[in-house]
Amino acid sequence: MSLLAIGINHNTASVDLREKVAFGPDKLGPALEQLREHEAVNGSVIVSTCNRTELYCDVKQGARNKLIDWLAQFHQVSREDLMPSLYVHEEQAAIKHLMRVSCGLDSLVLGEPQILGQVKQAFSDSRDHQAVDSSIDKLFQKTFSVAKRVRTETDIGGNAVSVAYAACTLAKHIFESLSDSTVLLVGAGETIELVAKHLASNGCTKMIVANRTKERAQGLAEQFGAEVISLNEIPDYLARADIVISSTASPLPIIGKGMVETALKQRRHQPILLVDIAVPRDVEAQVGELNDAYLYSVDDLQSIIDSNIEQRKVEAIQAEAIVSEESASFMTWLRSLQAVDSIRDYRKSANEIREELLSKSLQSLAAGADPEKVLRELSNKLTNKLIHAPTRALQSAAEQGEPAKLTIIRQTLGLDDL
């Protein structure tokens, strides 16, 4: 049994190569079936995301080049094109790499939590295709517990490092409960969709989506039970909003100082948080001059993000220490399994010798042989049979001039205690 991890990621390979070597839904099943039948593979999991493609395998000795050849052939990529971007980790290094990946320590965004879900899904897919053996199963189960420990003992995932998440985090800090807040989302693009997802996951149920075309916003609104309005209707709805988060491609501001001033009067000066993550601005800078209007720009969020990235780097030091400790512990456990197999084989061999000689001795006794003679013969033959292999090993080590090996055998046999 030997653990092997091979792959490419955003640090080693271009987008073009990552696309060529990706395992999409149509390729994953056939690939796992091929690995399941591969002569050099006992068990495998394929992790394939937009930023990485990796194989984690329990393999027989000498499987490294065979797996690299398989990966290249499966995707019809030349080995020469693949090798400069490929990394290979074996045994404890493979264990540590998987744990680092699952904890977000090897991600493009340090500490991002999504990768753990992707690794769990990859493991589930492999189990569904009967591609997982006991060693791979135990490795991934251990990895998931390590990832949980890292999340529990460190705050590596607790600081916002995306604009969308930072906007929601800011809103949470200012308002005690998002479940009681009405949020006006201006725009319906990818960033606003991410904002809506973060808001919903934090209990926000009252959202209004404003967009230039209502049709484009309808799909987003249906996901979160939001109202849909046009940009022209914003002045009529602004007073209802406790929080405004805006991200459009408009060349000119959409929300002006006068519009916000009117809304604040209608709200009897209950404060409004405005988070403008558009470039160029969606909200006039002068809005920040108003009492009870708290305006944050994308630059303000970026300073929060930069600070949080530095904090994640600090937390990553402790996370790396946990991964190093846990990967070493798991490797020790794996090695002990190899000893268990050897001990079982050794006991089986000794029992077979005992049963063979005991059977012959019982036959002799049944035939009327002298009991004392039978017992002496049994003890002599049993001794000779049991010490035969160790004797040969001692002789071989001495003849080949291997004093270190000779010392190990003597210690194993307990000869130094005599």
Swiss-Prot record:
The record marks H97 as: Important for activity. One of its GO terms (biological process) is protoporphyrinogen IX biosynthetic process from glutamate. The active site is at C50. Belongs to the glutamyl-tRNA reductase family. Homodimer. Pathway: Porphyrin-containing compound metabolism; protoporphyrin-IX biosynthesis; 5-aminolevulinate from L-glutamyl-tRNA(Glu): step 1/2. This is Glutamyl-tRNA reductase. Substrate binds at T49, C50, N51, R52, S107, E112, P113, Q114, Q118. It holds the Pfam family GlutR_N. PROSITE patterns: GLUTR. Keywords: NADP, Oxidoreductase, Porphyrin biosynthesis. GO terms for molecular function: glutamyl-tRNA reductase activity; NADP binding. The lineage of its organism: Bacteria, Pseudomonadati, Pseudomonadota, Gammaproteobacteria, Vibrionales. Its EC number is 1.2.1.70. It catalyses: (S)-4-amino-5-oxopentanoate + tRNA(Glu) + NADP(+) = L-glutamyl-tRNA(Glu) + NADPH + H(+). InterPro entries: 4pyrrol_synth_GluRdtase, 4pyrrol_synth_GluRdtase_dimer, 4pyrrol_synth_GluRdtase_N, GluRdtase_CS, GluRdtase_dimer_dom_sf, GluRdtase_N_sf, NAD(P)-bd_dom_sf, Shikm_DH/Glu-tRNA_Rdtase. The keyword Transmembrane does not apply. Catalyzes the NADPH-dependent reduction of glutamyl-tRNA(Glu) to glutamate 1-semialdehyde (GSA). During catalysis, the active site Cys acts as a nucleophile attacking the alpha-carbonyl group of tRNA-bound glutamate with the formation of a thioester intermediate between enzyme and glutamate, and the concomitant release of tRNA(Glu). The thioester intermediate is finally reduced by direct hydride transfer from NADPH, to form the product GSA. Possesses an unusual extended V-shaped dimeric structure with each monomer consisting of three distinct domains arranged along a curved 'spinal' alpha-helix. The N-terminal catalytic domain specifically recognizes the glutamate moiety of the substrate. The second domain is the NADPH-binding domain, and the third C-terminal domain is responsible for dimerization. The keyword NADP applies. It is an enzyme of class 1 (oxidoreductase). It comes from the Bacteria. NADP(+) binds at G187, A188, G189, E190, T191, I192.
